[in-house]
């Protein structure tokens, strides 16, 4: 949180120059000598050897995400994987939980738009035993009807409660309108309807056909050797059916005009989230739009919150995916006034020029934030996975700094002109407080 605030403040101090600036910022990436990539039984594995701590983070990525789902099956993968914690062929429920507690390990499931992450956190000494439990959860979950029903009830309750949380509801609505007609419009967590209809037979069929090694990529960060990782993978998930899945980046969503969804709620404030589509992760514009969103965040913070006191929370998020997504977010009692300010600040970013000194300060802050955000082994695993899957090479992760430094003020201006348009909005609050024509002007 502190890093985010610092970054907003740096973005807010960037100045506008009346003339173009073509200064090129350069930086050299350090070669990553700690990381290697290899295949085990057809499963790509990335291993980063870290000896500074006793923690092993192993993230197994089940590739496909929302593209694996339909409106009828949304939530099936998460339900299956969470229900597997209730017992497997080798580890009945109570044995599994007792063993995990003794090991001090954790296995977490995080469904996403492009993949589901199954994260193992263990000590070096406990890694093999924890991995054995994970492997059995994938290969041989018991899926007892009573246990599945308990897990289902938990998730249905959580989905229902989404309607009671303005931010959660806003995010759900914003995704649905921003990605209309695209798989990203499906929530991998599922809906009340889809979760209610899924049966134990559905879960067993999904496990048999979709928990296959061709959908898997493993990233391990910790003090474990390649030989150890190869043995563990070969003797466990390497024996799963291969399947026919082949990873490729999703197709970008169709270009759609500005639009909006309004959900009436009686609340102390109003919530707005708009998204616009950005470039692919392999484009130089990717880093340029990332910085443009940071600049816009800083200026919105200064104008909306600091100078006009119209909101306690406002920003321009940048979402990392195979193709990027930028956005505009605010909670406010005066949405029309804030929308006017957002329009003004986007126009300023398109028409003006950031000074080289201002850009250098922003990039330096990004570098600091980057290293803070990748301190833990788990964070590093996710960083390597995004680089490998979105950009085609895990080594792109170590080039993040040099890619940021290569962006010029003109690149940021062009990114704002090219991508900060056709914003698709979700609004939760009092419809009388917002003018629809202001939403469609973006």
Language-model features, listed with the residues they occupy:
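An aromatic/glycine/proline-enriched structural segment found at the starts
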Residues: 25-26, 180, 188, 212-213, ...
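M16/MPP (pitrilysin/insulinase) zinc-metallopeptidase core fold and M16-derived inactive scaffolds
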Residues: 59-124, 164, 187-188, 295-309
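Short acidic/His-enriched helical or mixed secondary-structure segments at domain edges of catalytic enzymes
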Residues: 154-173, 251-269, 306-310, 321, ...
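Bacterial N-terminal signal peptides
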Residues: 6-20
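M16/insulysin-pitrilysin zinc metalloprotease superfamily fold
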Residues: 86-90, 121-152, 318-373, 440-442
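C-terminal regions of mature proteins
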Residues: 24-28, 217-222, 277, 328-329, ...
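A structural supersecondary motif
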Residues: 66, 273-275, 293-332
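Scaffold signal of the M16-like zinc-metallopeptidase fold and its non-catalytic homologs
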Residues: 162-212, 233, 283, 313, ...
């Amino acid at each position: 949180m502190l890093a985010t605030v610092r970054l907003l403040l740096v973005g807010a101090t960037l100045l506008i120059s009346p003339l173009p600036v073509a200064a090129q910022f350069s930086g050299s990436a350090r070669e990553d000598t700690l990381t290697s990539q290899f295949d085990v039984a057809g499963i790509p594995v990335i291993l980063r050897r870290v000896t500074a701590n006793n923690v092993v983070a192993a993230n197994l990525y089940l590739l496909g995400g929302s593209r694996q789902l339909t409106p009828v099956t949304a939530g099936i993968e998460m339900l299956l994987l969470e229900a597997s914690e209730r017992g497997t062929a080798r580890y009945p429920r109570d044995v599994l939980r007792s063993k995990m507690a003794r090991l001090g390990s954790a296995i977490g499931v995080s469904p996403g738009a492009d993949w589901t992450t199954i994260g193992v956190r263990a000590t070096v000494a406990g890694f093999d035993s924890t991995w054995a439990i994970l492997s059995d959860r994938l290969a041989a979950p018991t899926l007892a009807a009573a246990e599945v029903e308990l897990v289902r009830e938990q998730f249905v309750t959580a989905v229902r409660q989404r309607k009671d949380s303005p931010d959660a509801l806003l995010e759900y609505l914003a995704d649905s309108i921003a990605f209309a007609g695209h798989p990203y419009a499906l929530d991998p967590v599922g809906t009340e309807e889809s979760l209610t209809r899924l049966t134990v037979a559905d879960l067993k069929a999904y496990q048999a056909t979709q928990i296959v090694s061709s959908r898997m990529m493993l990233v391990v960060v910790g003090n474990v050797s390649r030989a150890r990782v190869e043995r563990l993978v070969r003797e466990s998930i390497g024996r799963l059916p291969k399947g026919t899945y082949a990873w490729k980046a999703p197709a970008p969503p169709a270009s759609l005009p500005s639009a909006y969804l309004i959900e009436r709620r009686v609340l102390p404030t109003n919530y707005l989230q708009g998204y616009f589509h950005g470039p692919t992760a392999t484009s130089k514009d990717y880093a340029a739009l990332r910085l443009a969103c940071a600049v816009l965040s800083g200026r919105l913070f200064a104008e909306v919150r600091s100078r006009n006191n119209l909101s306690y929370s406002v920003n321009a998020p940048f979402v990392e995916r195979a193709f990027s997504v930028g956005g505009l977010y605010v909670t406010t009692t005066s949405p029309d006034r804030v929308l006017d300010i957002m329009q003004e600040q986007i126009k300023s970013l398109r028409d003006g020029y950031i000074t080289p000194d201002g850009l250098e300060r922003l990039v330096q802050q990004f570098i600091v934030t980057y290293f803070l955000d990748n301190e833990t082994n788990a964070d590093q695993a996710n960083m390597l996975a995004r680089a490998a899957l979105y950009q085609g090479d895990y080594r792109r992760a170590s080039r993040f700094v040099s890619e940021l430094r290569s962006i010029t003020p003109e690149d940021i201006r062009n990114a704002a002109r090219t991508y900060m348009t056709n914003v698709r909005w979700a609004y939760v609050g009092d419809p009388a407080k917002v003018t629809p024509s202001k939403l469609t002007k973006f």
